[in-house]
Amino acid sequence: MHQDFQEDEHEYPDIRRNPLHEVTMTSYILGILLGIFVGLFPQIRFKNFNLFIIALSLFHFLEYYITAKYNPLKVHSESFLLNNGKSYMAAHSFAILECLVESFLFPDLKIFSYSLATKLCTVLGCLLVILGQYTRTIAMHTAGHSFSHIVKTKKESDHVLVKTGVYSWSRHPSYLGFFWWAIGTQLLLLNPLSLVIFIFVLWKFFSDRIRVEEKYLIEFFSAEYIEYKNKVGVGIPFI
């Protein structure tokens, strides 16, 4: 048994980068948050906010879980992406603030049954959140060891060009999934201001990030990536 562990130890995450107390507490808090808003679902008038918190909790949990399961050598306590930069925190804080202010000033406008528009936005938001999460999760699973939360400037030994599964119809499916997931959350919250801001900021962010990342991917894989790029789009409009 000890010999088997030694043979497979390269597949296990580095415990020094995964303090168990941090991972355990983060998972516990996300689970509590999800449980609270599932439990409050029948009691809160604006149920869309509950759905948003549930989706947000699941997103951050799955970021760590999928990385740990399918890319264990790269997992670390920051893989939850809770510390995803000041811009990320500011965007969600603004969205929640807008939702709460509008719920106080115009409570009826935040109700699913208020109008056909609120019903359509809610249903479309739910669909985008589900499809976006599914696309990102499957992308991380499919890429396996080749997936990274940060742009790689040097080619690693286990980095291969993945062109199968979701990568056969989008060359950046994890970005595609997050783009539509995030837009879906703002439709779900019925946030007109945040919806416009999210679309603009996310489009600019992914446009710049993909341009930088693909410069390195061309260095790593040369003509193979250029051919792949010419055949497969991204899926985010105008990128």
From Swiss-Prot:
Belongs to the class VI-like SAM-binding methyltransferase superfamily. Isoprenylcysteine carboxyl methyltransferase family. PROSITE patterns: SAM_ICMT (PS51564). InterPro entries: ICMT_MeTrfase, PPMT_MeTrfase. Residues 176-206 dip into the membrane without crossing it. The lineage of its organism: Eukaryota, Fungi, Dikarya, Ascomycota, Saccharomycotina. Its EC number is 2.1.1.100. S-adenosyl-L-methionine binds at residues 159-162, 167, 172-175, 213. Substrate binds at residue 209. Present with 2690 molecules/cell in log phase SD medium. Gene3D superfamilies: 1.20.120.1630. Keywords: Endoplasmic reticulum, Membrane, Methyltransferase, Pheromone response, S-adenosyl-L-methionine, Transferase, Transmembrane, Transmembrane helix. It comes from the Eukaryota. The chain crosses the membrane at residues 24-44, 48-68, 89-109, 111-131. This is Protein-S-isoprenylcysteine O-methyltransferase. It is a multi-pass membrane protein. PANTHER family: PROTEIN-S ISOPRENYLCYSTEINE O-METHYLTRANSFERASE (PTHR12714), PROTEIN-S-ISOPRENYLCYSTEINE O-METHYLTRANSFERASE (PTHR12714:SF9). Disulfide bonds: none annotated. Pfam families: ICMT. The keyword Protein transport does not apply. Optimum pH is 7.
